[in-house]
């Protein structure tokens, strides 16, 4: 049974370490218009995720931004949509790596039950969050493009976007931090 506790401790350690690692990743690595983060044709601008009813259950999952004050909040003002778009890429990357690294649980607890624990851990703790990021990103990109167009004609309105086309001249360090 102590193999179970080692696997559980390993999973907990992955979860705890995921936040500081995600915060430390350079934001310039994450462009929502490039693979693997760009919306694929089969995703139909995020509409394919409506079949999974993500809108209904996404707010019921734990939100780490409530526990970690330095995390980007799930809900930001419309004035800063690109920051949130970028964070969806970071979150997707971190959760994908958590799936890969969680294979270590299978070596710590060699049991048929370890496969079940691994599957539940990844479906609830990682795949669901990846789906939420893939669902939200196209919607947030449309909001960012709308904001860009709205600000284009008004030189006195402060835009949080770096150029007329999101990420065309993009530098992560130029994004505002809220």
Where are these regions (language model features)?
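Hydrophobic transmembrane alpha-helices
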Residues: 94-138
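Cytosolic/matrix-facing juxtamembrane and C-terminal tails of multi-pass cellular membrane proteins
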Residues: 130-178
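Loop-to-transmembrane boundary segments
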Residues: 76-98
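Membrane-proximal soluble regions of multi-pass membrane proteins
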Residues: 29-84, 146-159, 164-166
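Inner-leaflet juxtamembrane helices
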Residues: 22-36, 129-144
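Long, highly hydrophobic alpha-helical transmembrane signal-anchor segments
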Residues: 1-40, 90-108
């Amino acid at each position: 049974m102590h193999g179970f506790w080692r696997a559980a401790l390993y999973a907990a350690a992955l979860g705890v370490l995921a936040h500081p690692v995600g915060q430390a990743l350079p934001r310039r690595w994450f462009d929502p218009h490039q693979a693997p983060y760009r919306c694929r044709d089969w995703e139909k601008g995020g509409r394919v995720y409506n079949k999974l009813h993500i809108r209904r259950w996404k707010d019921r999952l734990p939100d780490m931004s409530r526990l970690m004050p330095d995390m980007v909040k799930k809900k930001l003002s419309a004035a800063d949509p690109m920051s949130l778009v970028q964070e969806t890429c970071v979150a997707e990357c971190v959760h994908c790596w958590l799936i890969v690294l969680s294979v270590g649980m299978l070596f710590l607890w060699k049991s048929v039950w370890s496969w079940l624990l691994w599957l539940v851990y990844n479906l609830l703790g990682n795949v669901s969050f990846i789906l939420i990021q893939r669902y939200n990103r196209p919607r947030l990109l449309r909001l960012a493009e709308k904001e860009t167009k709205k600000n284009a004609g008004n030189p006195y309105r402060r835009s949080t976007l770096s150029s007329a086309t999101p990420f065309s001249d993009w530098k992560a360090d130029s994004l505002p931090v809220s």
